[in-house]
């Protein structure tokens, strides 16, 4: 009560921010007459003037009123469009490292030109981030005339572009691209073998469009660059044949874990577990298929990878559904993004899951991959000096933006008041009744000429509704991941009178639905249209536009509630833009995923008590409230998962930054001989210490062992025992010095053969290659550690602290290995002629190119229990009895594959 009273008196934080900014808007408006008087040349000259002022030390914020006034005037001259006051407010919000919540149709693309221009004046580059290539290209081309009029360059960063074109795009003042491409370029730059191969500049200012989609929905999606591992496609096919013999256990009995079924499915965590009965059957079937020998157990250490195949195949069959989670197109399994409903060409699930799905669908199985580099969007975008974003729906996630990205959310008012009617939800008992009610509603709406947009949560559901509409004889367009190319065209005409459009999730997001259809699209379809033709098209459109408004504007039908209220709001937000009329309603059934998992028992009990008849719907505030609570539960659970993921990833992130900065330093210098010399001293000291403990008696020395180690690891054949026999005065210190001096002498002789310059080049190559190879193994080991770390909780230890401690010691061990391997490689390599060094370099380049061609940019299935990635690389590595089992089950080794040992 008191808080409400204080808010009324002083205004909310949002009100106070807007009040402060409105004063600046008044200053900008006052400058308008002055700007109108300037010639085009004088207006263009303002950019150079602003840059000169910045160089003299003026603060960027002081330029806001004048810079925004210049952009507004330029936009009037180039586009004939004047920024509204609310767009100026949005521009200021975006410049202040905030999220601007601007409703659909309020002109976010035009708003973005203001902060993009202002921050481009620094010359450090501005990255405008969009959700797909089409929007990146569209926005760049639309805004290019404005920026070029003001003397700024514009670049577009698209997947598959050659490195020189990418470098040029990043060198531009303002670069447009997708979140995936920026992230992958960052990773690729940190795998480059020479400074010239890098494409990005230092990350300065990112302006993220649809910021909720990128920073929240995709936050759990690490970007992974992976190279090919060993081929095991045959095994996937063989294991796949066995899975149909298993029966799913309907209810998991947590006490005994017994039941009639062979495996249980946890839909919330997307995991599959074998029951005891299932384990026995699987072992029998594996023996029958000749995959496993009789008498062997699936839990024997030799079968760790087999267990991984079985788990992957089970998950592929039980949890992943065709046309919901993926589609099969041209003999390929293509992932469908669960948040946007779009296909993700080129992305692959990790941990063998993608191969298991390929085996299930009977398409060609592609090789498994090994992670070479990875980063989450959360950590990538936090690398920017300055970050801001805009979306139509951010307020529900304001707390997350603030706690993870330190970004405040400011709700920017609409230019015209909102008059859309959001009707209460209708809840049916079954899916079939719900679909029937939707068809009836569509018939009713289209009969009076009202356009309808139907939002579904998956391709499968969109095709189900489409089939029913076809049966009912209603013409309609389907917009889902399968028809990506026509997306914008279909959306542009979704406002046509009586048009019916079915869209998955947010397909077509970023394209406005204009009531009456898009007259621009009609004009674009004509070849060289005359002025009369254009006028006629506009006049026809005006008639249609008025007719649609009279019929009630665009009507939105939601066929199911999403896990997040925000995505529901996005669907609703497609209607009622710029103060237009519109309406929306969600249709639900007790068979919907959200209701089944989170709200079923209470609500269905309530509905039965009310004596529901088939085809009848319940429309009550209690039900709507129960659904909102279910969504809140899911949202908070997802937030906790993302927060947990970030806390764990922060550990890896610190290590990643350390490795990448060291790698970049290495790339930028041409001579690493000083580093090599200091590393050599450390390595030889540690090696000698292992055989001659410091300040020890001669009886404690292991001279034969030391001689053998120096010979095997450093190619140093030294008669140490002979020296000690012949020279009694040789003590520990002088012996150490002599061994080091001998190693330097041998190395210098090699250098004389190939020449100093060639040797420096070779040293740098060896360091880079060793660093990359060890970092790759370290990533797999970290992944592996992460899978079982939660079990430390049972030992009353904080898993997070344990993870930090262990990963730090692994990192320290990796750095020690790096030193050792570099010196060992350089000592053992036999080089005789400069040509041989050049040949080695050439081999390295060819290997890098081969890897680059085979690299996969993959989509990490975030809930997956990773398989024994490290075990696969290191073969028969000894696993401690209390370590997490390498099969990825999450159990201790002694309770899993170590049970029989």
Swiss-Prot record:
Gene3D superfamilies: Helical scaffold and wing domains of SecA (1.10.3060.10), P-loop containing nucleotide triphosphate hydrolases (3.40.50.300), SecA, preprotein cross-linking domain (3.90.1440.10)
Enzyme Commission code(s) on record: 7.4.2.8
Entry's Gene Ontology cellular component terms: cell envelope Sec protein transport complex; cytosol; plasma membrane
Cofactor(s) annotated in UniProt: Zn(2+)
Binding sites annotated in the UniProt record for ATP: 87, 105-109, 512
Keywords for this protein: ATP-binding, Cell inner membrane, Cell membrane, Cytoplasm, Membrane, Metal-binding, Nucleotide-binding, Protein transport, Translocase, Translocation, Transport, Zinc
Family: Belongs to the SecA family.
Protein name, UniProt field: Protein translocase subunit SecA
Protein's organism: Escherichia coli O1:K1 / APEC
């Amino acid at each position: 009560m008191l808080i409400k009273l204080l808010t009324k008196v002083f205004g909310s934080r949002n009100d106070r921010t807007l009040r402060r900014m409105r004063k600046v808007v008044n200053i900008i408006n006052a400058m308008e007459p002055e700007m109108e008087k300037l010639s085009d040349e004088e207006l263009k000259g303002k950019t150079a003037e602003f840059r000169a002022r910045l160089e003299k030390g003026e603060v960027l914020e002081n330029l806001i009123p004048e810079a925004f006034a210049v952009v507004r005037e330029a936009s009037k001259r180039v586009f004939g469009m004047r920024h509204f006051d609310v767009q100026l407010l949005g521009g200021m919000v975006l410049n202040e490292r905030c999220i601007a919540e601007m409703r659909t149709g309020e002109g976010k693309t035009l708003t973005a030109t203001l902060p993009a221009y202002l921050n481009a004046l620094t010359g450090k580059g501005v990255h405008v981030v969009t959700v797909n290539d089409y929007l990146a290209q569209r926005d760049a081309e639309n805004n290019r005339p404005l920026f070029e009029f003001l003397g700024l360059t514009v670049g577009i960063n698209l997947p598959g572009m050659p490195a020189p074109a990418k470098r040029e795009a990043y060198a531009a003042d303002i670069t447009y691209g997708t979140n995936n491409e920026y992230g992958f370029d960052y990773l690729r730059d940190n795998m480059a073998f020479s400074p010239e191969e890098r494409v990005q500049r230092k990350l300065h200012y990112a302006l993220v469009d649809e910021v909720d989609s990128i920073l929240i929905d995709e936050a759990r999606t690490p970007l992974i660059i992976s190279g090919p591992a060993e081929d095991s496609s045959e095994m996937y096919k063989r294991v796949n044949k066995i899975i149909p013999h298993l029966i799913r256990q309907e209810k998991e009995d947590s006490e005994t874990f017994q039941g009639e079924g062979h495996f249980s499915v946890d839909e919330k965590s997307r995991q599959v577990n074998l029951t005891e009965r299932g384990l026995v059957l699987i072992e029998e079937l594996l023996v029958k298929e000749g995959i496993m020998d009789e008498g062997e157990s699936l839990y024997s250490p030799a079968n760790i990878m087999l267990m991984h195949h079985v788990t992957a195949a089970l998950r592929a069959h039980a949890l992943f559904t065709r046309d919901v989670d993926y589609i099969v197109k041209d003999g390929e399994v293509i992932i469908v993004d669960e948040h946007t409903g779009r296909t993700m060409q080129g992305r692959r699930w990790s941990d063998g899951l993608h191969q298991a799905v390929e085996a299930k669908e009977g398409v060609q199985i592609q090789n498994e991959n090994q992670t070479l580099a990875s980063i989450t969007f959360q950590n990538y975008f936090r690398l920017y000096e300055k970050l801001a974003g805009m979306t139509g729906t951010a307020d529900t996630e304001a707390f997350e933006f603030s706690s993870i990205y330190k970004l405040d959310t400011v709700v920017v008012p609409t230019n015209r008041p909102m008059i859309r009617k959001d009707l209460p939800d209708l809840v049916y008992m079954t899916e079939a009744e719900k679909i029937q009610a939707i068809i009836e509603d569509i018939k009713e709406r289209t009969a009076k000429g009202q356009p309808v947009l139907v939002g579904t949560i998956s391709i499968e559901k969109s095709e189900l509704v489409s089939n029913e509409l076809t049966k009912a004889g209603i013409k309609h367009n389907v917009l889902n991941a399968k028809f990506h190319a026509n997306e914008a065209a279909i959306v542009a005409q979704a406002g046509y009178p009586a048009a019916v459009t079915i869209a998955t999730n947010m397909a077509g997001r970023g394209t406005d639905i204009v009531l009456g259809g898009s007259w621009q699209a009609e004009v674009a379809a004509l070849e060289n249209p005359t002025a009369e033709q254009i006028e006629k098209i506009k006049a026809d459109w005006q008639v249609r536009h008025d007719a649609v408004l009279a019929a009630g504007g665009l009507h939105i039908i939601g066929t199911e509630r999403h896990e997040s209220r925000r995505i529901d709001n996005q669907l609703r937000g497609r209607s009622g833009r710029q103060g237009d009329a519109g309406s929306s309603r969600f249709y639900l059934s007790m068979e919907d995923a959200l209701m089944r998992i989170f709200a079923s028992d209470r609500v269905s009990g309530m509905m039965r008590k009310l004596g529901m008849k088939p085809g009848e719907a319940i429309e009550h505030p209690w039900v709507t409230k129960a659904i909102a609570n279910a969504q809140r539960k899911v949202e908070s659970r997802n937030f906790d998962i993302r927060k947990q993921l970030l806390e764990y990833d922060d550990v890896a992130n610190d290590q990643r930054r350390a490795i990448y900065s060291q790698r970049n330093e290495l790339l930028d210098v041409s001579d690493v001989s000083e580093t090599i010399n200091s590393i050599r001293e450390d390595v030889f000291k540690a090696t000698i210490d292992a055989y001659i403990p410091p300040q020890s008696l001669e009886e404690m020395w292991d001279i034969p062992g030391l001689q053998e180690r120096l010979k095997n690891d450093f190619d140093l054949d030294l008669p140490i025992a002979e020296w000690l026999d012949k020279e009694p005065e040789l003590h520990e210190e002088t012996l150490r010095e002599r061994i080091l001096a001998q190693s330097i002498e041998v190395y210098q002789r090699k250098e004389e053969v190939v020449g100093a310059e060639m040797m420096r080049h070779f040293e740098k190559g060896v360091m880079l290659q060793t660093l990359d190879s060890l970092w790759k193994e370290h990533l797999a080991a970290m992944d592996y550690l992460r899978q079982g770390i939660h079990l430390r909780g049972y030992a009353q230890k904080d898993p997070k602290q344990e993870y930090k401690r262990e990963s730090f010691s692994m990192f320290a061990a990796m750095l020690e290995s790096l030193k050792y391997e570099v010196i060992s490689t350089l000592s053992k390599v036999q080089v005789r002629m400069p040509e041989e060094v050049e040949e080695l370099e050439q081999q390295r380049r060819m290997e890098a190119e081969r890897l680059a061609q085979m690299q996969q940019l993959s989509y990490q299935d975030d809930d997956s229990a990773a398989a024994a990635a490290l075990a696969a690389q290191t073969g028969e590595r000894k696993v401690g009895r209390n370590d997490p089992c390498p099969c990825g089950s999450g159990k201790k080794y002694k309770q899993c594959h170590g049970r029989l040992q």
